[in-house]
A protein has these predicted regions:
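Canonical Rossmann dinucleotide-binding motif of NAD(H)/NADP(H)-dependent dehydrogenases/reductases
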Residues: 2-56
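C-terminal helical subdomain
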Residues: 150, 218, 237-292
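Rossmann-fold cofactor-recognition segment
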Residues: 73-89
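Rossmann-fold scaffold of SDR-type NAD(P)-dependent oxidoreductases
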Residues: 10, 106-124, 148, 175, ...
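Catalytic loop of short-chain dehydrogenase/reductase
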Residues: 15-18, 132-137, 165-197, 202-203, ...
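Conserved Rossmann-fold SDR core element
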Residues: 199, 209-226, 274-280
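Catalytic Tyr-X3-Lys loop
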Residues: 109-112, 127-153, 198
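Amphipathic alpha-helical dimer-interface segment in Rossmann-like NAD(P)H-dependent oxidoreductases
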Residues: 99-100, 116, 143-169, 207
Length: 292
């Protein structure tokens, strides 16, 4: 097999932009599809930064998203798999297609897994993950953990059953969680619960799989302009919590970066000639007291 791997990226999604932000480098330029501006979630940012440099297999949510990724990132529509990885049938279909493509191309397969940020069947107050403990919809936690943890374990098990790992000398599995996995913040209990669950699970998976030359990397990004902060309530609460910590931020100055930064971190892990266990990355200005 050649050294240039096939990269499977799960959880990729584009969201119509409802709010436009600026970064420390100026106004953020959003992707455009049929006249509409779109924001990338973490996985979509990985797609954008790797497209054209690697063969990609993108696992998203809706069939219609294939056309968006094709036009904005150059991903062929036959390399987009709409799937709900909480469903056993979709896991099997995804793993089967990935294994077949791995053998067709004759290259190693690496996995980039993203479990999403707020995928839950439970109704969230204000449609936001941000909530004080007294107002938190705790029944959302099982859904959030399922999307971040169960999907990863089931996918890895299915890929193993299809012989993916046995056909290559080593494998890189990169899971994108969040800085919230290790840095708690007021009113962010739901996000902390799902990402911290993923963080702990990944540490255990790494102990299990490293002896088999399956190397596990966790990437923990900070506040990202994915559409999460387009919700007015979420933005207002985030600013209030930030002010309680002594930082005078507004919607115009709230520290955010784009998902391209996450994609660049993934690119480094893919190319690094070593086992990269963890990467934490924050936008400039996000909670300097946590800078250490």
């Amino acid at each position: 097999m050649t050294q240039q791997p096939l990269i499977m990226i799960t959880g990729a999604k584009m969201t119509p932009a409802k709010r436009h932000f600026t970064s420390q480098f100026g106004r953020i330029e959003y992707l455009t599809y049929q006249g509409q501006h779109y924001k990338m979630n973490a996985a979509a940012g990985v797609v954008k930064q790797l497209a054209g440099q690697y063969d990609l297999l993108v696992v998203g949510y809706q069939p219609d998203d294939a056309a968006i990724f094709a036009e904005t990132c150059g991903v062929p529509t036959d390399r987009f798999i709409p799937a709900d990885l909480r469903r056993a049938a979709d896991i099997e279909r995804t793993a089967s297609q990935a294994a077949a493509l791995q053998q067709e191309l004759g290259v190693p397969l690496y996995v980039v897994h993203y479990g999403g940020a707020s995928d839950t069947k439970a109704a969230l107050p204000h449609n936001s993950l941000l909530a004080h403990t007294w107002d938190m919809e705790a029944m959302a936690i099982p859904d959030l953990v399922e999307n971040n943890c169960v999907t990863l374990v089931k996918l890895l098990q299915a890929l193993r059953q299809h012989g993916v790992f046995a056909r290559q000398p080593y494998t890189k599995v990169i899971s994108v969680t969040a800085a919230a996995a290790v840095r708690a913040k007021a009113h962010l209990g739901l996000d902390v619960a799902q990402k911290a669950a993923g963080h702990g699970l990944l540490r255990s998976i790494a102990l299990d799989l490293t002896p088999e030359n399956i190397f596990i990397t966790e990437i923990m990004p900070g506040s990202t302009d994915t559409g999460f902060f387009d919700n007015d309530y979420t933005m207002d609460e985030a600013i209030r919590v930030t002010r309680d910590l002594g930082y005078d931020k507004t919607p115009e100055t709230y520290p955010l970066f784009t998902a391209e930064q996450i994609g660049d971190a993934v690119k480094y892990v893919i190319t690094a000639q070593c086992n990269v266990r963890e990467i934490a990355l924050l936008p400039y200005g996000q909670f300097p007291h946590l800078g250490a």
